[in-house]
Regions:
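Short hydrophobic/aromatic beta-strand micro-patches
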Residues: 48-50
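N-terminal beta1-alpha1 ligand-phosphate binding loop
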Residues: 33
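Conserved histidines in hydrophobic membrane contexts and catalytic metal-binding motifs
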Residues: 30
Length: 102
Protein backbone atom coordinates (compact mmCIF):
# COMPACT_ATOMS: atom_id res chain seq x y z
CA UNK A 1 0.00 0.00 0.00
CA UNK A 2 1.40 3.38 -1.02
CA UNK A 3 1.85 5.59 2.03
CA UNK A 4 2.60 9.06 0.64
CA UNK A 5 0.73 11.95 -0.91
CA UNK A 6 3.93 13.84 -1.77
CA UNK A 7 4.09 13.95 -5.59
CA UNK A 8 7.90 13.65 -5.64
CA UNK A 9 7.78 10.47 -3.60
CA UNK A 10 4.78 9.11 -5.53
CA UNK A 11 6.91 9.31 -8.66
CA UNK A 12 9.56 7.13 -7.00
CA UNK A 13 6.90 4.64 -5.87
CA UNK A 14 5.41 4.46 -9.38
CA UNK A 15 8.88 3.69 -10.81
CA UNK A 16 9.30 0.74 -8.42
CA UNK A 17 5.69 -0.48 -8.39
CA UNK A 18 6.06 -2.78 -11.45
CA UNK A 19 8.79 -4.73 -9.61
CA UNK A 20 7.04 -5.21 -6.24
CA UNK A 21 5.58 -8.61 -7.04
CA UNK A 22 8.47 -9.83 -9.20
CA UNK A 23 11.05 -9.23 -6.45
CA UNK A 24 8.81 -9.68 -3.41
CA UNK A 25 9.39 -6.09 -2.26
CA UNK A 26 7.71 -5.62 1.11
CA UNK A 27 8.85 -2.09 1.92
CA UNK A 28 10.27 0.96 0.13
CA UNK A 29 11.93 3.79 2.05
CA UNK A 30 13.54 7.02 0.91
CA UNK A 31 16.30 8.81 2.81
CA UNK A 32 18.74 11.63 2.21
CA UNK A 33 17.92 14.90 0.48
CA UNK A 34 14.67 13.60 -1.04
CA UNK A 35 13.37 12.54 2.37
CA UNK A 36 14.24 15.95 3.80
CA UNK A 37 12.80 17.88 0.85
CA UNK A 38 16.22 19.40 0.16
CA UNK A 39 16.96 17.82 -3.21
CA UNK A 40 18.40 19.76 -6.13
CA UNK A 41 18.13 18.87 -9.84
CA UNK A 42 21.52 17.13 -9.50
CA UNK A 43 20.56 15.07 -6.42
CA UNK A 44 20.38 11.33 -6.65
CA UNK A 45 17.62 9.45 -4.85
CA UNK A 46 18.55 7.19 -1.93
CA UNK A 47 16.22 4.19 -1.75
CA UNK A 48 16.03 1.22 0.62
CA UNK A 49 14.05 -1.81 -0.58
CA UNK A 50 13.19 -4.84 1.51
CA UNK A 51 13.31 -7.70 -0.99
CA UNK A 52 11.71 -10.96 0.06
CA UNK A 53 13.03 -13.11 -2.79
CA UNK A 54 16.61 -14.25 -3.19
CA UNK A 55 18.11 -12.36 -6.11
CA UNK A 56 21.60 -12.22 -7.48
CA UNK A 57 23.78 -9.17 -7.87
CA UNK A 58 23.00 -8.89 -11.60
CA UNK A 59 19.25 -8.87 -10.92
CA UNK A 60 19.75 -6.21 -8.25
CA UNK A 61 21.83 -4.07 -10.63
CA UNK A 62 19.18 -4.58 -13.33
CA UNK A 63 16.48 -3.41 -10.90
CA UNK A 64 18.54 -0.31 -10.10
CA UNK A 65 19.06 0.46 -13.80
CA UNK A 66 15.36 -0.03 -14.60
CA UNK A 67 14.34 2.37 -11.82
CA UNK A 68 16.93 4.93 -12.98
CA UNK A 69 15.67 4.70 -16.56
CA UNK A 70 12.07 5.23 -15.46
CA UNK A 71 12.94 8.20 -13.23
CA UNK A 72 15.62 9.57 -15.59
CA UNK A 73 17.67 10.15 -12.44
CA UNK A 74 20.58 8.46 -10.66
CA UNK A 75 19.64 6.44 -7.62
CA UNK A 76 21.46 4.67 -4.82
CA UNK A 77 19.61 1.44 -4.08
CA UNK A 78 20.16 -0.46 -0.85
CA UNK A 79 18.82 -3.48 0.96
CA UNK A 80 18.62 -2.86 4.74
CA UNK A 81 21.32 -5.42 5.48
CA UNK A 82 23.79 -3.63 3.20
CA UNK A 83 23.69 -0.30 5.05
CA UNK A 84 26.91 0.52 6.87
CA UNK A 85 26.49 -0.27 10.56
CA UNK A 86 27.91 3.03 11.77
CA UNK A 87 25.23 5.09 9.96
CA UNK A 88 22.39 2.59 9.69
CA UNK A 89 20.47 3.89 12.72
CA UNK A 90 20.67 7.48 11.47
CA UNK A 91 19.54 6.49 7.96
CA UNK A 92 16.61 4.44 9.23
CA UNK A 93 15.57 7.22 11.62
CA UNK A 94 15.29 9.76 8.80
CA UNK A 95 13.89 7.37 6.17
CA UNK A 96 10.35 7.90 4.92
CA UNK A 97 8.35 4.77 4.17
CA UNK A 98 6.52 5.21 0.87
CA UNK A 99 5.29 1.62 0.48
CA UNK A 100 4.59 -1.19 2.89
CA UNK A 101 3.07 -4.56 2.11
CA UNK A 102 -0.04 -5.25 4.12
Amino acid sequence: MMLTKDSRLKKVYKAIEPFIEEFGISQIRIFGSYARGEETPQSDIDIIVDIGKQIGIYQFIGLKQDIEATLNKNIDLFKPNTLEAFIKDQILAEAITIYEQR
